[in-house]
Amino acid sequence: MVERFYLGHSCELIESVRKWELKMQGRYNIDLINPFKGNKFENMEELKELKTRKKLLAYMKTLSDETNEKIVTYDLELLRKCDGVVALFNNPSVGTAMEIFAGAYLYRIPVYVICRNYIHHPWIAHLCWVSGGGAFTSRKKFEEYLTKLGLRRY
């Protein structure tokens, strides 16, 4: 059986996360659902160029209320259809924090947070615990966890 995980991450990581996503799906019996792969943004290429927080914040100021609603609704629909959340949180973003919360409290699915500096933050620790997920200091440690669960392909 293939587990479906919502892949939460900041906008600045779109390209590097895509490489990891493909590697993970080839190595493990998981399907990573990347919210940036959908058509919620009018110009995905423009979004890929927003590699700094300053540029991203300036871009967000240009979004209409309708676009904001489309983004949030799309993300929540994806989350609802998943078995869990994998959140890359080394570059914390408001969106990823909301996805962690929604996964744990709204949809009651396991939340796995990968981050170096925040795994002991009360919100991260509690949401991972209450959801039945976990917090990991690296992607490698998360991969080791998936192997222990028997999700590695041989």
Where are the model-predicted features located?
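Conserved catalytic or regulatory cores that recognize and/or transform ribose-phosphate-containing ligands
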Residues: M1-Y154
